[in-house]
Amino acid sequence: MSIDRALNFDDLRAIAKRKLPKIVFDFVDGGVEDETCLARNRSAFQDYRLLPHYLVDVSKRDQSVSLFGRRYNSPFGISPMGLAGLAYPGVDLLLAKAAAEANVPYLMSNASNATIEAAAAVAPHNTWFQIYATTDERINIDLVRRARDLALETLVVTVDVPVNSNRERNRRNGFSRPPKMTLAVFLESLLHPRWVARFILSGGIPAMENWGVYAPPGSGRDGGGDLYGTLTPAPSMTWARLEEIRSRWSGNLVVKGILSPADAVRAVEAGANGVILSNHGGRQLDAAPSPLDVLPAVRAAIGERAEILLDSGVRRGSDILIALALGARLTLFGRPMLFGAAAGGEAGVRHALALMRREVDIVMGQIGVPELAAIGSHSLWPPGS
Protein backbone atom coordinates (compact mmCIF):
# COMPACT_ATOMS: atom_id res chain seq x y z
CA MET A 1 0.00 0.00 0.00
CA SER A 2 1.36 3.44 -0.94
CA ILE A 3 1.19 6.33 1.49
CA ASP A 4 -1.48 8.03 -0.63
CA ARG A 5 -3.77 5.03 -0.20
CA ALA A 6 -3.53 5.13 3.60
CA LEU A 7 -6.97 6.31 4.64
CA ASN A 8 -6.51 6.25 8.41
CA PHE A 9 -4.02 5.66 11.19
CA ASP A 10 -4.52 1.89 11.08
CA ASP A 11 -3.41 1.92 7.44
CA LEU A 12 -0.26 3.82 8.39
CA ARG A 13 0.41 1.32 11.15
CA ALA A 14 0.09 -1.59 8.70
CA ILE A 15 2.60 -0.03 6.31
CA ALA A 16 5.00 0.77 9.15
CA LYS A 17 4.80 -2.79 10.44
CA ARG A 18 6.05 -4.07 7.09
CA LYS A 19 8.85 -1.54 6.84
CA LEU A 20 10.28 -1.60 10.36
CA PRO A 21 12.31 -4.30 12.08
CA LYS A 22 10.15 -6.12 14.61
CA ILE A 23 12.18 -4.82 17.54
CA VAL A 24 11.57 -1.21 16.44
CA PHE A 25 7.91 -1.69 15.55
CA ASP A 26 7.23 -3.37 18.88
CA PHE A 27 9.02 -0.57 20.73
CA VAL A 28 6.72 1.99 19.13
CA ASP A 29 3.54 -0.08 19.11
CA GLY A 30 3.78 -1.92 22.40
CA GLY A 31 2.46 -1.29 25.86
CA VAL A 32 3.20 -2.76 29.25
CA GLU A 33 2.66 -6.33 30.52
CA ASP A 34 -0.62 -7.76 29.12
CA GLU A 35 -1.34 -4.51 27.25
CA THR A 36 -4.84 -4.30 28.69
CA CYS A 37 -4.31 -0.59 29.34
CA LEU A 38 -3.37 -0.16 25.69
CA ALA A 39 -6.64 -1.80 24.64
CA ARG A 40 -8.63 0.12 27.25
CA ASN A 41 -7.44 3.42 25.81
CA ARG A 42 -9.25 2.58 22.58
CA SER A 43 -12.33 0.93 24.07
CA ALA A 44 -12.93 3.96 26.29
CA PHE A 45 -13.66 6.09 23.23
CA GLN A 46 -15.86 3.38 21.77
CA ASP A 47 -18.03 3.47 24.89
CA TYR A 48 -19.22 6.99 24.01
CA ARG A 49 -21.68 8.16 21.36
CA LEU A 50 -21.80 11.53 19.64
CA LEU A 51 -25.32 12.93 19.23
CA PRO A 52 -25.91 14.68 15.88
CA HIS A 53 -27.85 17.96 15.79
CA TYR A 54 -29.21 18.60 12.31
CA LEU A 55 -30.56 21.64 10.44
CA VAL A 56 -27.52 23.59 11.61
CA ASP A 57 -25.56 25.62 9.07
CA VAL A 58 -22.25 23.78 8.85
CA SER A 59 -21.29 25.05 5.40
CA LYS A 60 -18.29 26.72 7.03
CA ARG A 61 -16.48 24.81 9.76
CA ASP A 62 -13.69 26.15 11.94
CA GLN A 63 -11.68 23.64 13.97
CA SER A 64 -9.19 26.16 15.35
CA VAL A 65 -8.73 26.36 19.10
CA SER A 66 -7.20 28.88 21.51
CA LEU A 67 -4.79 27.56 24.11
CA PHE A 68 -2.44 29.53 26.37
CA GLY A 69 -3.00 32.68 24.36
CA ARG A 70 -2.16 31.14 20.99
CA ARG A 71 -4.55 30.11 18.24
CA TYR A 72 -3.91 26.67 16.74
CA ASN A 73 -5.48 25.44 13.51
CA SER A 74 -6.75 22.16 14.96
CA PRO A 75 -7.64 20.73 18.39
CA PHE A 76 -4.78 18.26 18.38
CA GLY A 77 -1.01 18.12 18.65
CA ILE A 78 1.91 15.71 18.60
CA SER A 79 2.75 13.86 21.81
CA PRO A 80 6.34 13.72 23.08
CA MET A 81 8.19 10.56 22.06
CA GLY A 82 11.63 9.45 23.15
CA LEU A 83 13.90 7.62 20.71
CA ALA A 84 11.55 8.54 17.87
CA GLY A 85 14.49 8.52 15.49
CA LEU A 86 14.47 4.73 15.48
CA ALA A 87 11.37 4.85 13.30
CA TYR A 88 12.92 7.20 10.76
CA PRO A 89 16.18 9.20 10.81
CA GLY A 90 15.66 12.86 11.66
CA VAL A 91 11.99 12.37 12.46
CA ASP A 92 12.01 14.76 15.44
CA LEU A 93 12.69 17.74 13.20
CA LEU A 94 10.27 16.45 10.56
CA LEU A 95 7.60 16.45 13.27
CA ALA A 96 8.53 19.97 14.33
CA LYS A 97 8.39 21.19 10.73
CA ALA A 98 5.05 19.50 10.05
CA ALA A 99 3.58 20.91 13.26
CA ALA A 100 4.62 24.42 12.26
CA GLU A 101 3.12 23.98 8.79
CA ALA A 102 -0.14 22.66 10.23
CA ASN A 103 0.01 25.13 13.13
CA VAL A 104 -0.48 22.58 15.90
CA PRO A 105 1.63 21.99 19.03
CA TYR A 106 4.65 19.71 18.90
CA LEU A 107 5.78 18.42 22.28
CA MET A 108 9.46 17.55 22.00
CA SER A 109 10.75 14.96 24.45
CA ASN A 110 14.03 15.58 26.18
CA ALA A 111 14.74 11.94 25.26
CA SER A 112 14.44 12.78 21.56
CA ASN A 113 17.10 12.26 18.91
CA ALA A 114 17.48 15.95 18.09
CA THR A 115 18.14 18.93 20.32
CA ILE A 116 15.51 21.28 21.59
CA GLU A 117 17.56 24.08 20.07
CA ALA A 118 17.21 22.52 16.61
CA ALA A 119 13.46 22.01 17.03
CA ALA A 120 12.97 25.59 18.23
CA ALA A 121 14.79 26.85 15.15
CA VAL A 122 12.39 24.91 12.91
CA ALA A 123 9.17 25.60 14.83
CA PRO A 124 9.69 28.40 17.38
CA HIS A 125 5.98 29.03 18.01
CA ASN A 126 4.80 25.42 17.98
CA THR A 127 7.48 23.60 19.97
CA TRP A 128 6.84 22.79 23.60
CA PHE A 129 9.64 21.17 25.63
CA GLN A 130 8.77 18.04 27.62
CA ILE A 131 11.17 17.02 30.37
CA TYR A 132 11.55 14.19 32.84
CA ALA A 133 13.05 15.01 36.20
CA THR A 134 16.43 13.37 36.73
CA THR A 135 18.37 12.48 39.84
CA ASP A 136 20.85 15.27 38.97
CA GLU A 137 19.36 18.59 40.03
CA ARG A 138 21.94 20.54 38.03
CA ILE A 139 20.66 18.96 34.83
CA ASN A 140 17.05 19.57 35.85
CA ILE A 141 17.84 23.25 36.28
CA ASP A 142 19.74 23.44 33.01
CA LEU A 143 16.96 21.81 30.98
CA VAL A 144 14.61 24.54 32.18
CA ARG A 145 17.24 27.18 31.40
CA ARG A 146 17.59 25.92 27.83
CA ALA A 147 13.85 26.22 27.27
CA ARG A 148 13.87 29.69 28.81
CA ASP A 149 16.83 30.87 26.70
CA LEU A 150 15.00 29.75 23.56
CA ALA A 151 11.95 31.81 24.59
CA LEU A 152 9.74 28.74 24.36
CA GLU A 153 6.25 29.38 25.65
CA THR A 154 5.37 26.04 27.24
CA LEU A 155 7.26 23.58 29.43
CA VAL A 156 5.81 20.12 30.01
CA VAL A 157 6.88 18.09 33.04
CA THR A 158 6.06 14.39 32.80
CA VAL A 159 5.39 12.80 36.19
CA ASP A 160 4.11 9.29 35.40
CA VAL A 161 7.47 7.51 35.27
CA PRO A 162 8.54 7.19 38.92
CA VAL A 163 10.15 3.84 38.05
CA ASN A 164 10.76 1.93 34.84
CA SER A 165 7.82 -0.13 33.65
CA ASN A 166 7.60 -3.79 32.71
CA ARG A 167 7.48 -3.67 28.91
CA GLU A 168 7.58 -7.34 28.09
CA ARG A 169 7.61 -6.91 24.31
CA ASN A 170 10.85 -4.96 24.63
CA ARG A 171 12.35 -7.52 26.98
CA ARG A 172 11.52 -10.42 24.68
CA ASN A 173 13.07 -8.60 21.74
CA GLY A 174 16.22 -7.64 23.62
CA PHE A 175 15.49 -3.93 23.28
CA SER A 176 17.66 -1.61 25.36
CA ARG A 177 17.77 2.11 26.10
CA PRO A 178 19.88 3.56 24.66
CA PRO A 179 19.68 1.10 21.75
CA LYS A 180 22.58 -1.30 21.25
CA MET A 181 23.44 -3.30 18.13
CA THR A 182 23.02 -6.81 19.47
CA LEU A 183 23.12 -9.98 17.37
CA ALA A 184 19.31 -10.21 17.48
CA VAL A 185 18.96 -6.62 16.29
CA PHE A 186 21.51 -7.23 13.53
CA LEU A 187 19.78 -10.36 12.25
CA GLU A 188 16.34 -8.74 12.29
CA SER A 189 17.71 -5.68 10.51
CA LEU A 190 18.89 -7.81 7.60
CA LEU A 191 15.24 -8.34 6.70
CA HIS A 192 14.77 -4.57 6.33
CA PRO A 193 17.67 -3.32 4.18
CA ARG A 194 16.07 0.05 3.41
CA TRP A 195 15.71 0.80 7.11
CA VAL A 196 19.36 -0.15 7.61
CA ALA A 197 20.47 1.94 4.63
CA ARG A 198 18.75 5.04 6.00
CA PHE A 199 20.63 4.77 9.26
CA ILE A 200 23.96 4.07 7.59
CA LEU A 201 23.53 7.17 5.43
CA SER A 202 22.47 9.26 8.44
CA GLY A 203 25.38 8.23 10.63
CA GLY A 204 24.11 5.19 12.51
CA ILE A 205 21.70 4.48 15.35
CA PRO A 206 20.44 7.89 16.55
CA ALA A 207 21.79 9.36 19.75
CA MET A 208 19.94 11.22 22.51
CA GLU A 209 21.14 14.60 21.30
CA ASN A 210 19.64 16.66 24.12
CA TRP A 211 21.90 14.85 26.54
CA GLY A 212 25.17 15.11 24.65
CA VAL A 213 26.11 18.36 26.41
CA TYR A 214 25.96 16.60 29.78
CA ALA A 215 27.99 13.52 28.86
CA PRO A 216 31.52 13.19 30.25
CA PRO A 217 34.33 13.78 27.73
CA GLY A 218 35.28 10.66 25.80
CA SER A 219 32.06 8.84 26.67
CA GLY A 220 31.29 7.78 23.11
CA ARG A 221 28.86 8.72 20.37
CA ASP A 222 25.78 8.35 22.57
CA GLY A 223 27.33 9.15 25.90
CA GLY A 224 24.33 11.35 26.54
CA GLY A 225 22.01 8.38 26.14
CA ASP A 226 24.13 6.33 28.53
CA LEU A 227 23.97 9.16 31.06
CA TYR A 228 20.21 9.48 30.62
CA GLY A 229 19.87 5.80 31.45
CA THR A 230 21.70 6.27 34.75
CA LEU A 231 19.84 9.43 35.84
CA THR A 232 16.28 8.48 34.95
CA PRO A 233 13.75 7.73 36.20
CA ALA A 234 13.80 9.84 39.36
CA PRO A 235 11.75 8.05 42.06
CA SER A 236 12.38 10.95 44.44
CA MET A 237 10.39 13.41 42.29
CA THR A 238 7.84 15.18 44.52
CA TRP A 239 5.42 18.07 44.48
CA ALA A 240 8.10 20.20 46.12
CA ARG A 241 10.39 19.61 43.15
CA LEU A 242 7.58 20.52 40.77
CA GLU A 243 7.13 23.78 42.67
CA GLU A 244 10.87 24.37 42.32
CA ILE A 245 10.58 23.98 38.55
CA ARG A 246 7.64 26.40 38.59
CA SER A 247 9.78 28.96 40.41
CA ARG A 248 12.39 28.81 37.66
CA TRP A 249 9.93 28.95 34.77
CA SER A 250 7.75 31.98 33.97
CA GLY A 251 6.00 30.52 30.93
CA ASN A 252 3.15 28.05 30.65
CA LEU A 253 3.70 24.99 32.83
CA VAL A 254 1.89 21.77 31.95
CA VAL A 255 2.02 18.58 34.02
CA LYS A 256 1.76 15.40 31.96
CA GLY A 257 0.70 12.00 33.25
CA ILE A 258 -2.10 13.07 35.58
CA LEU A 259 -4.97 10.61 36.12
CA SER A 260 -6.17 11.37 39.66
CA PRO A 261 -8.55 14.32 40.14
CA ALA A 262 -6.77 15.02 43.43
CA ASP A 263 -3.42 15.15 41.63
CA ALA A 264 -4.89 17.53 39.08
CA VAL A 265 -5.95 19.86 41.88
CA ARG A 266 -2.49 19.58 43.44
CA ALA A 267 -0.85 20.39 40.11
CA VAL A 268 -2.93 23.54 39.75
CA GLU A 269 -2.06 24.53 43.32
CA ALA A 270 1.62 24.02 42.44
CA GLY A 271 1.27 26.56 39.64
CA ALA A 272 0.43 24.46 36.59
CA ASN A 273 -1.44 26.20 33.80
CA GLY A 274 -2.58 22.89 32.41
CA VAL A 275 -2.53 19.14 32.85
CA ILE A 276 -2.26 16.37 30.29
CA LEU A 277 -4.38 13.39 31.25
CA SER A 278 -2.28 10.45 30.13
CA ASN A 279 -1.32 6.90 31.04
CA HIS A 280 1.77 7.18 28.85
CA GLY A 281 -0.02 5.46 26.00
CA GLY A 282 -0.47 2.31 28.06
CA ARG A 283 3.28 2.03 28.59
CA GLN A 284 3.59 2.43 32.38
CA LEU A 285 0.85 0.83 34.53
CA ASP A 286 -1.28 -1.85 32.91
CA ALA A 287 -4.02 -1.46 35.53
CA ALA A 288 -4.33 2.30 34.98
CA PRO A 289 -7.61 3.84 33.84
CA SER A 290 -8.02 5.45 30.47
CA PRO A 291 -7.52 9.23 30.55
CA LEU A 292 -10.92 9.58 28.89
CA ASP A 293 -12.55 7.73 31.78
CA VAL A 294 -11.17 10.18 34.36
CA LEU A 295 -11.67 13.32 32.25
CA PRO A 296 -15.13 14.29 33.59
CA ALA A 297 -13.99 13.91 37.20
CA VAL A 298 -10.83 15.93 36.59
CA ARG A 299 -12.78 18.71 34.90
CA ALA A 300 -15.20 18.79 37.83
CA ALA A 301 -12.29 18.92 40.28
CA ILE A 302 -10.33 21.79 38.72
CA GLY A 303 -13.13 23.66 36.98
CA GLU A 304 -11.75 26.34 34.69
CA ARG A 305 -8.64 27.00 36.75
CA ALA A 306 -6.41 25.19 34.25
CA GLU A 307 -6.54 23.74 30.78
CA ILE A 308 -7.00 20.00 30.27
CA LEU A 309 -5.28 18.16 27.45
CA LEU A 310 -5.53 14.42 26.82
CA ASP A 311 -3.55 11.73 25.09
CA SER A 312 -3.45 7.91 25.00
CA GLY A 313 -5.67 6.17 22.49
CA VAL A 314 -6.65 9.07 20.21
CA ARG A 315 -6.94 7.58 16.72
CA ARG A 316 -10.01 9.13 15.07
CA GLY A 317 -11.53 12.55 14.60
CA SER A 318 -14.55 11.36 16.55
CA ASP A 319 -12.24 10.57 19.48
CA ILE A 320 -11.16 14.18 19.56
CA LEU A 321 -14.71 15.52 19.49
CA ILE A 322 -15.68 13.14 22.30
CA ALA A 323 -12.78 14.36 24.43
CA LEU A 324 -13.68 17.99 23.77
CA ALA A 325 -17.32 17.32 24.65
CA LEU A 326 -16.17 15.91 27.99
CA GLY A 327 -14.09 18.98 28.82
CA ALA A 328 -10.68 18.68 27.18
CA ARG A 329 -9.26 21.64 25.30
CA LEU A 330 -6.88 19.74 23.04
CA THR A 331 -5.80 16.16 22.39
CA LEU A 332 -2.45 14.61 21.52
CA PHE A 333 -1.29 11.50 19.70
CA GLY A 334 2.16 10.08 19.08
CA ARG A 335 2.41 6.58 17.64
CA PRO A 336 0.49 7.44 14.43
CA MET A 337 3.05 10.13 13.66
CA LEU A 338 5.90 7.63 13.86
CA PHE A 339 3.93 5.15 11.78
CA GLY A 340 3.45 7.91 9.21
CA ALA A 341 7.18 8.62 9.20
CA ALA A 342 8.09 4.95 8.85
CA ALA A 343 5.53 4.58 6.06
CA GLY A 344 6.48 7.62 4.04
CA GLY A 345 9.08 9.85 5.65
CA GLU A 346 8.27 13.55 5.62
CA ALA A 347 5.27 12.98 3.34
CA GLY A 348 3.97 10.35 5.76
CA VAL A 349 4.18 12.75 8.69
CA ARG A 350 2.24 15.40 6.80
CA HIS A 351 -0.26 12.79 5.66
CA ALA A 352 -0.95 11.68 9.24
CA LEU A 353 -1.81 15.22 10.32
CA ALA A 354 -3.93 15.78 7.22
CA LEU A 355 -5.89 12.59 7.87
CA MET A 356 -6.82 13.71 11.36
CA ARG A 357 -7.69 17.23 10.28
CA ARG A 358 -10.00 15.84 7.60
CA GLU A 359 -11.72 13.50 10.06
CA VAL A 360 -12.30 16.26 12.59
CA ASP A 361 -13.82 18.42 9.86
CA ILE A 362 -16.17 15.64 8.73
CA VAL A 363 -17.34 14.80 12.25
CA MET A 364 -17.98 18.47 13.03
CA GLY A 365 -20.25 18.63 10.01
CA GLN A 366 -22.00 15.39 10.90
CA ILE A 367 -22.88 16.44 14.45
CA GLY A 368 -23.83 20.06 13.69
CA VAL A 369 -20.81 21.83 15.16
CA PRO A 370 -19.60 24.69 12.94
CA GLU A 371 -16.99 25.72 15.52
CA LEU A 372 -15.52 23.98 18.53
CA ALA A 373 -17.10 26.41 21.00
CA ALA A 374 -20.43 24.78 20.08
CA ILE A 375 -19.48 21.35 21.41
CA GLY A 376 -20.32 20.25 24.94
CA SER A 377 -22.01 17.56 26.98
CA HIS A 378 -25.15 18.02 24.86
CA SER A 379 -23.13 16.54 21.99
CA LEU A 380 -23.04 13.15 23.73
CA TRP A 381 -25.65 10.42 24.12
CA PRO A 382 -27.01 9.99 26.67
CA PRO A 383 -26.79 13.77 27.25
CA GLY A 384 -24.15 14.62 29.80
CA SER A 385 -22.71 11.10 29.74
Per-region residue spans from a language model:
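A generic secondary-structure signal marking the coil-to-beta-strand transition
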Residues: 46, 68, 72-76, 125, ...
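Alpha/beta enzyme core
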Residues: 83, 97, 122, 135-310, ...
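Glycine-rich active-site/cofactor-binding loop and its immediate structural neighborhood
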Residues: 72-111
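Short, charged beta->alpha transition segments
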Residues: 60-69, 94, 107-119
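Short, conserved beta-strand segments within well-ordered enzyme catalytic domains
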Residues: 49, 64-66, 75-79, 105-107, ...
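Alpha/beta catalytic cores of nucleotide-metabolism and tRNA/nucleoside-modifying enzymes
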Residues: 1-46, 293-385
